[in-house]
């Protein structure tokens, strides 16, 4: 690349090109470091990145593109991801909403497919921590899990389409506790013994089928 180093250039607005003259970046500098807007281009001349810098560090909104399509938006503070971030699919539909604190995922993230919410997940310090829920495209809850520092912790439940619990598994910091419990669509535990003759007679007297 024929462009001289930033520290040797006094201008604040620059075009960086390769040896063939193709434009790679439009940048702003102050005292030889990136400061202000940056725009990067692919071989077709399309924008692949827009970002803001302060004293050589990303600071403000960054956007990433695939051709003319926006792929991601993310906020930065002093070089670290901070605040909301969004991802988009090839059709421009939102696929994820996340939040960052000091460069780590924090709080609730939401994930989408075909415009529908399919997962919510909670993070602490970049690790799964708290409840994660998965949904079908019809909005029905499919599974609810719980995490502590990226390890399964607590009860994991899977559901039938009618909302009844299909399966229950308990965990303690990633280790399964006890047996996997299965249930039919009426909520009855599979493998559970039927009622004794006396109990069945009492059920019939109460009018229970």
Question: Which residue ranges define each predicted feature?
Answer:
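Glycine/tyrosine- and acidic-biased, solvent-exposed loop/turn segments at the edges of beta-strands
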Residues: 1-209
């Amino acid at each position: 690349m024929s462009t001289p180093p930033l520290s040797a250039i006094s201008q604040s607005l620059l075009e960086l090109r390769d040896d063939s003259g193709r434009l790679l970046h439009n940048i702003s500098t102050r005292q030889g470091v990136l400061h202000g807007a940056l725009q990067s281009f692919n071989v077709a001349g399309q924008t692949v990145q827009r970002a803001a810098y302060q004293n050589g560090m990303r600071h403000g909104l960054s956007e990433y593109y695939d051709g003319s399509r926006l792929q991601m938006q993310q906020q930065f503070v002093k070089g670290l991801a901070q605040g909301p971030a969004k991802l988009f699919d090839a059709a421009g539909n939102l696929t994820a909403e996340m939040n960052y604190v000091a460069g780590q995922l924090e709080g609730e993230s939401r994930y989408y497919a075909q415009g529908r919410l399919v997962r919510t997940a909670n993070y602490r310090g970049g690790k799964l921590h708290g409840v994660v829920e998965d949904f079908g495209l019809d909005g029905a809850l499919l599974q609810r899990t719980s995490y502590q520092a990226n390890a399964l912790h607590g009860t994991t439940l899977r559901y039938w389409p009618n909302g009844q619990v299909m399966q229950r598994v308990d965990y303690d910091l990633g280790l399964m506790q006890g047996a996997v419990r299965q249930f039919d669509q009426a909520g009855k535990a599979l493998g559970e013994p039927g009622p004794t003759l006396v109990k069945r007679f009492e059920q019939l007297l109460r009018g229970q089928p």
